[in-house]
Amino acid sequence: MRASLPVHLVVCTQLSAVWFGVAKAHGGHRLEPHVPGFLQGFTDITPAGDDVSANVTSSEPAKLDLSCVHSDNKGSRAPTIGEPVPDVSLEQCAAQCKAVDGCTHFTYNDDSKMCHVKEGKPDLYDLTGGKTASRSCDRSCFEQHVSYEGAPDVMTAMVTSQSADCQAACAADPSCEIFTYNEHDQKCTFKGRGFSAFKERGVLGVTSGPKQFCDEGGKLTQEEMEDQISGCIQLSDVGSMTADLEEPMEADSVGACMERCRCDGRCTHFTFNDNTRMCYLKGDKMQLYSSPGDRTGPKSCDSSCFSNGVSYVDDPATDVETVFEISHPIYCQVICAANPLCTVFQWYASEAKCVVKRKGFYKHRKTGVTGVTVGPREFCDFGGSIRDREEADAVGSDDGLNAEATMANSPDFHDEVECVHTGNIGSKAQTIGEVKRASSLSECRARCQAEKECSHYTYNVKSGLCYPKRGKPQFYKYLGDMTGSRTCDTSCLRRGVDYSQGPEVGKPWYSTLPTDCQVACDAEDACLVFTWDSATSRCYLIGSGFSAHRRNDVDGVVSGPYTFCDNGENLQVLEAKDTE
């Protein structure tokens, strides 16, 4: 029998931490929290007009970028903060805006030399001698040819010749997260939470940017990543009438409740009540209704595997279900995930309509269709890929959820990431040794394989740090993290073999990857074999006497030994030992 392996175990369903844009302890990570920049009030202005702000450390005065100034007699009707400042230059007025908390833009008058520091959204009008500009002309964090036009607007659109004005307007409204500026009609549109699902690349004449000014730390990619973690959760007073999967439990936060849903293979969405702190896991499509204190969200907010502008055309032969009043494509994905016949979904922005489709959809594919979003039934950070779904449907292959697609030598097998959670998934399991940088995911995996006790690893693509881990994975969300098994070798795993009715050891455990079940079994001293059920994502950890409960030709299951395949173990040898 196997040797004793002392490991501290924490099951996935007990996790409560999730990253929502706030720095938290993370297994040895050196955290660099995202903190909005600010400027203190400046104490002096040089005769030349340069800003000597409290945060300027250089001996040379700071040079202000004034490239976004409306120099064509433009003022702003927006409220002025405090009293106008007299007898200053344009440069000094720009510096004054930067020094005043809450200033989003300013108006300077060439004739009167008066400076009006403004708050709120720029409201431009013709003013003799007027020059108006955003708090910052830095556009380094804007992205060209990127559009979020399909996302719902949270503010009235604004017409301006300067894209920097769009950022000033967005910064003034707490509901705005990002803006999109169209150079052709000089119009800004403003988008709120959930915007990331509507991203389109390659749109000529369009620029998008974050609400936070670039020179104060604004990053569009950061906003996107945070939106894909929590942007689709209902803000307040929205519950779900869908039946609960189990008795509700207390949770520390809405993030902790979401994490419980992520760890349960049956869960499609959840409801958390801010007043009672109770967490309700749901296993069917959302049935939203008004409920005081409730906040409801899907298993995942990640929309990175969706495609915008693609349509499969409605067809009774492939349409399984049509649902109206669906406000976001993520909610459409939940409906698809809850329907066993669904392979992909199609969401129409103008009608708030969700159509879920079965196999055979690909032959109706069209591109360049405005206002339509499509995606796979699998949540993006759980391996969902619309491209893989399309390829499988085009050749008439089996459903991508069955066990064949999870095994080596299958057509869609990619050994680099087959056993890796790529969607901002970290592990809180104990880190082995010193945390060091790695040049790639592969190097981090090799480092894990060089450590005798390493069962899995976490690699952060942003910092390049590699964390070899021991014991059972303890998954949670963390930006940039990827977590994988020690090896992607699945040669000793067997499809269709089921030991799930054998003597279970440890607590129920869930994962979307069968290789994680092997890691969990290896970490559980009494576990000899595991069975993974693809339909529920449940890992059955089975102990001595398992061989008497073997069943063959069971659809959707994968079984394997507790030791990794590249160590030479196999089920046949273990079964022989088990019957001795």
Swiss-Prot record:
CDD domains per UniProt: APPLE_Factor_XI_like (cd01100)
InterPro entries with a match to the protein in the record: Apple (IPR000177), Pan_app (IPR003609)
Gene3D superfamilies from the UniProt entry: Hepatocyte Growth Factor
Pfam family, any one: PAN_4
Source superkingdom: Eukaryota
Residues making up the signal peptide according to the UniProt record: 1-25
Post-translational modification as stated in the protein's UniProt record: Proteolytically cleaved at the N- and C-terminus after release from the microneme.
GO biological process terms, semicolon-separated: cell adhesion; effector-mediated perturbation of host innate immune response by symbiont; effector-mediated suppression of host innate immune response; immune system process; proteolysis; symbiont-mediated perturbation of host receptor-mediated signal transduction
GO cellular component: cytoplasmic vesicle; extracellular region; host cell endosome; microneme
MF (Gene Ontology): carbohydrate binding; galactose binding; host cell surface binding; Toll-like receptor 2 binding; Toll-like receptor 4 binding
Primary residence: cytoplasm
Cellular compartment(s): Cytoplasmic vesicle, Secretory vesicle, Microneme; Host early endosome
Residue span, Apple domain: 68-137, 141-214, 232-301, 305-375, 419-488, 492-565
Function according to Swiss-Prot or TrEMBL: Soluble adhesin with carbohydrate-binding activity. Binds to galactose-terminating oligosaccharides. Required for attachment of the parasite to the host cell prior to invasion. Triggers the activation of murine bone marrow-derived dendritic cells and macrophages and production of pro-inflammatory cytokines, such as IL12 (IL12B/IL12A), in host TLR2/TLR4-dependent manner. Triggers the production of anti-inflammatory cytokine IL10 in murine bone marrow-derived macrophages in host TLR4-dependent manner.
Domain text: The first and second apple domains are sufficient for targeting the protein to the micronemes.
Quaternary structure note: Monomer. Part of the MIC6-MIC1-MIC4 complex. Interacts (via the second apple domain) directly with MIC1 (via the beta-finger region). Interacts with murine TLR2; the interaction promotes activation of bone marrow-derived dendritic cells and macrophages in the host. Interacts with murine TLR4; the interaction promotes activation of bone marrow-derived dendritic cells and macrophages in the host.
Identification of the protein by name: Micronemal protein 4
Species, as recorded: Toxoplasma gondii
